[in-house]
């Protein structure tokens, strides 16, 4: 059985709409913050670095107001990109006010 992998992109913006960071999902890397939130929601096996958490980390200490998440299939068509429980927990913890995603 093979795992279906998707291209996921996350972008963080400040309240004025300035782009602070962009990041992609990684099926090969992880980060202690990813592990922390995965453990917090009981999904310890989901430790690969999600695009949302990578983008939040890249923004560093800047105040993130909005995060946008895009997901595309192999054919390049947009797919549902609603953040998972892990990323929802991180978004909430970092005080991000607006969450947008492809549908």
Residue ranges of model-derived segments:
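Zinc-dependent deaminase catalytic domain
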Residues: 1-103
């Amino acid at each position: 059985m093979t795992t279906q992998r998707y291209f996921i992109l996350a972008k963080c913006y400040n309240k004025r709409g300035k782009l602070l960071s962009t990041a992609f999902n990684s099926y090969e890397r992880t980060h202690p913050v990813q592990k922390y939130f995965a453990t917090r929601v009981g999904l310890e096996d989901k430790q690969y670095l999600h695009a949302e958490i990578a983008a939040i980390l890249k923004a560093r200490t800047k105040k993130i107001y909005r995060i946008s998440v895009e997901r595309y299939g192999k054919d390049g068509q947009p797919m549902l990109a609603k953040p998972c429980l892990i990323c929802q927990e991180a978004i909430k913890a970092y005080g991000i006010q607006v969450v947008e995603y492809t549908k």
